[in-house]
A protein has these predicted regions:
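Phosphate-binding/switch loop-helix module in NTP-utilizing enzymes
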Residues: 99-165
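Conserved nucleotide-binding/hydrolysis micro-motifs of P-loop NTPases
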Residues: 65-69, 98-102, 148-149, 183-187, ...
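NTP-binding/hydrolysis catalytic cores, primarily Walker-type P-loop NTPases
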Residues: 1, 6, 27, 117, ...
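Phosphate-binding/switch region of NTP-binding enzymes
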Residues: 175-176, 180-240
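Nucleotide-state-sensitive switch-loop elements of NTP-binding domains
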Residues: 75-114
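Catalytic-core regions built around general acid/base machinery
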Residues: 48-52, 129, 161-172
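The Walker A/P-loop phosphate-binding site
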Residues: 1-78
Length: 240
């Protein structure tokens, strides 16, 4: 039986139950959360991360689209309050966008500033962050939200190389990783290559959620689909 982590998203775990897995996000796997703009990709990632924090799962959170303060504000809108997890260092954040907007903050043990325009620096800080959360637990959650800005500031193949290194590091350390991406940011060939790098994909289109899991050990792809809603408490999946 494949071990999974409860998602904290009502209806999602029931949707993904199978004879192979208990339902939820497969533990120590990588998942691409993608779809058109404004369909709940960031909400899905944040909801999963917050559920983990509630259960004392350390989280490495890389934000490239919005600065730390905006991330906190967005999560607060769903009553997901993360300040205490920042203070107790369960949550480790790498802010890859605030430097570009001129917003400055002091680096701390678990808050690091970087730049999407300097992916080498980001990867160094991801390495440091991964070691930090791994020391707390040999299983943790990692979020990268999102690939969009990385593609905007760097050549596509460079981003793919960075992503491969990020995913490899995540797997080696035992992290369960979610990465967000908006369809159409790159060409179709790059998107297909992107999807092939992940163990699982979750597509949100504003009405339907489609989950595909590639179980390499048995050479089988499992697929599930349902409708979903975005509520004031986050995403709710309506069941099979």
């Amino acid at each position: 039986m494949i071990q999974t982590i409860e998602s904290g998203i009502p209806g999602f775990d029931q949707l993904t139950v199978s004879e192979l897995a208990e339902g939820g996000i497969p533990e120590k796997s990588t998942t691409l959360v993608y779809g058109p703009p404004k369909t709940g990709k960031s909400i899905f990632c944040n909801q999963f991360a917050y559920e983990g924090l509630l259960k004392q799962e350390p989280c490495l959170y890389v934000t490239t689209d919005q600065g730390l303060k905006q991330v906190q504000s967005n999560m607060m809108g769903f009553n997901w309050l993360i300040q205490s997890y920042i203070q107790n260092q369960t949550l480790y954040i790498i802010d890859g966008i605030s430097q570009l907007s001129g917003t400055k903050f002091e680096d701390t043990n678990n808050l690091k500033s970087s730049s999407v325009g300097n992916p080498a620096d980001m990867m160094v800080k991801v390495g440091i962050g991964t070691r930090s959360v791994y020391k707390k637990s040999n299983h943790f959650i990692s979020i990268l939200d999102s690939l969009n800005t990385l593609f905007a500031f760097n050549q596509e193949q460079m981003v793919i190389r960075i992503l491969k290194a990020y995913l490899r590091r995540n797997r080696e350390a035992g992290g369960t990783g979610l990465i967000a991406y908006t369809e159409g940011v790159t060409d179709s060939d790059t998107e297909n290559e992107l999807k092939s790098l992940f163990d699982n994909t979750i597509r949100l289109d504003g009405e339907y959620i489609r989950v595909e899991s590639n179980f390499e050990d048995i050479d089988e792809v499992k697929s599930n689909e349902s409708t979903y809603m975005i509520t004031d408490k986050g995403i709710v999946v309506n069941g099979k």
